[in-house]
């Protein structure tokens, strides 16, 4: 996948004010589509633990998108907190972050990536499907509430 020009993607600390703002935007966007009792919002503090790596996309130094890889058990990685600001959507940034997450997962020897997204997020589905992910049943400890769509991708 080609990285959008003028966008740099790197692993960064989630404990930055600018990232807190971006995560708050993500949470608001999710709550507009899904009842709060069915949202699982990983906080920046949770992302700061050793099992999660946060990728941030910056355009002209400004954080415009993010996505995280959380290492689970048995060689499974979970894609978390994927978000692109509306003024940068449709430019391939989400797909580029997803490719970075997958590359890190492969380097770390993970054998499978999984994720949970909302049932009203067709733009997200397209990003995941273009990235080679396939729909599956519930993953990890997520319940099948009817508000979620699950994806997986074998890496090995």
Language model features with spans:
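Charged, amphipathic alpha-helical coiled-coil/dimerization segments
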Residues: 91, 103, 112-114
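Acetyl-CoA-dependent GNAT
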Residues: 3-80, 85-87, 98-100, 104, ...
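Active-site acidic-Proline motif in GNAT/NAT acetyltransferases
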Residues: 85-87, 91, 119
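C-terminal "cap" of GNAT-fold acetyltransferases
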Residues: 2-4, 8, 14-15, 111-114, ...
């Amino acid at each position: 996948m080609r990285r959008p020009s003028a966008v740099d993607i790197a692993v960064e600390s989630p404990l930055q004010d600018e990232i807190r703002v971006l995560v708050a935007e993500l949470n608001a966007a999710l709550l507009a589509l899904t009842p709060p009792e069915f949202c699982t919002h990983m906080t920046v503090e949770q992302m700061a633990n050793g099992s999660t790596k946060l990728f941030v996309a910056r355009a002209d130094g400004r954080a415009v998108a993010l996505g995280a890889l959380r290492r689970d058990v048995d060689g499974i990685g979970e894609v978390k907190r994927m978000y692109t600001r509306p003024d940068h959507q449709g430019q391939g940034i989400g797909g580029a972050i997803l490719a970075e997450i997958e590359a890190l997962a492969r380097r770390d020897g993970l054998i499978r990536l999984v994720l949970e997204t909302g049932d009203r997020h067709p733009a997200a589905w397209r990003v995941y499907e273009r990235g080679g992910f396939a729909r599956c049943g519930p993953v990890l400890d997520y319940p099948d509430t009817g508000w979620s769509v699950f994806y997986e991708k074998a890496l090995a």
